[in-house]
């Protein structure tokens, strides 16, 4: 019977069917799940839009018109829409909402995470928006997720999957912050959509597809909130910077630890009481056990503030305040224009889940 449960779940989510006798409580569970997915879809469908961006490009005395589309969703009653970057420097942006079309302008863009904040010139008469609430605890592996997306020119529809893992890396490429890997299948036009848990809480935005694995990456709600706030305020995102170079090395317990290797000249790290060889333990109360967690700390650090570094030096634990500076240069996002992660990151030596160069360095 265990093998029949996933198949029955898929059938029940897609349509109402007659349940075979004898399933008992399992049948009630299936119907409850189906009903909950339908409720989440009904609650959120008026907030989701299809976003289109067009740009004219002249080449060889010919004008080529480029059109990209994706999903997006309202995040305020004023008509702000969060979506992916779509096209670089588009000539025109518009959204489709319940068979109506609305012009939009780009308020701001974050090249690091490839998110854009739009605002419609005229608000729809009947729309809702997605609220960002901070979850009390981290999303557990195996949690059921519900996405509401705009695939190609089809109607807005729900899709579902499970939370598979939290990831900091894709091959040897370091994500700007911790990502959620899910089993949500993403096709064309479905990047930029909101994803919810079964309580209807916003979990994240569809960020990138992994079609060969039947998986996808979601940018978590906490990161979306960080980006949204800065884009609303200034149209750009100011990320923090410590100016330290680190190495990941084996310790005496055959585990890994993060050592400070060097400092960028004139950086906050170089001006602090941190020293080369210090073992990083915590930043702003968060444990640092990998380069990904260091990148995460840098992602959420606000320029102009101080954060507390906890380091181990000569078998002693020290607490050292470090001022956060504005990151001098924001790298481009790693996504291809279609919302997929480039195949060049997946080679025999850099495959997902493969061995990582433990002596690699990073300067957050």
Which residues make up each language-model segment?
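PDZ/PDZ-like groove recognition
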Residues: 185, 232-297, 312, 316-323, ...
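C-terminal cap/linker of serine protease catalytic domains
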Residues: 28-41, 126-127, 147, 151, ...
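Terminal peptide-recognition signature
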Residues: 46-51, 72, 79, 83, ...
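N-terminal activation segment of mature serine protease catalytic domains
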Residues: 21-86, 92, 140, 144-145, ...
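Conserved active-site neighborhood of the chymotrypsin/trypsin-like protease fold
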Residues: 27-28, 56-57, 74-157, 188, ...
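Active-site region of chymotrypsin-like
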Residues: 47, 54, 65, 121-130, ...
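Short, small/polar residue-rich loop motifs at catalytic or cofactor-binding pockets
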Residues: 67-69, 89, 187-191, 213, ...
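Bacterial N-terminal signal peptides
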Residues: 8-16
